[in-house]
Amino acid sequence: LTIAKEKKIKYFYQLTLPLEKRRLMLGKMCYLILTLFGANVVLSVGATLGGSVLTTSVPVSGAFPAVVVLTITYLWEIPFFLFLSIRFGMFVTVLTGVLLAVLGTGMASSGNWWMFAPAIPIRVVCPLLHVLPNGLRAGDALLDAGVLLPGIILSLFWFFVATVLFLKWFERKEVR
C-alpha cells in the first residue's frame, strides 16, 4: 500500500532524498521483513489459541520455529512483490500472489517442490507443525524434516537473487 501512495507522486520524495536509491529500498525491505515476522507471530498466536478451542491445534513446540522458518522462506516475496507493485500496480500484485499461493500448494507435495519458490514455505512448515495440506495421513513424506535446511537455503538464495535484480532495476528509475 505504501508503494501505491508513492507511485501517485512518482516517487518524488524517495528519489530526491540525498540517499542512494539502493539504501532507501533496503530500508523499506528491512521494514517489510519485520512486518512479515510480526504478522507471522500474530498468525501463530491466533492459530495456537484458536486451536485450543477447535479440534485441530498447532503444537506450541513447533509454533516459534515455524514463525522463524516461514519468515525466512517468504523473504523472496518482498523484493518480487515490491517490483510487481511498482511496475504493474496492486491488482496485478494481489492476483499474482493468489495464483502463486495456489500453484505453490499444489507443488508442495510433489517431488519438485524445491524448483518452485512459492512451494518451499508450504513444504518446510509441514514437519514443524505436523499440519498436512489436503488432509494427508500421518507418516506421509511431507513430514520429513530433511527438507528444512535445503528449503531455507533455497529461499535465501531466491531472496538474494530477487533483491539484487530488484535493486538494480530500482536504481535505474528516475524522477519524472
Locations of the language-model features?
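Short helix-to-coil transition segments within interhelical loops
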Residues: L15-K21
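Membrane-interface elements of multi-pass transporters and channels
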Residues: E6-K7, V45, L49-S57, R87-F91, ...
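Terminal transmembrane helical anchor/hairpin motif
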Residues: L100-K173
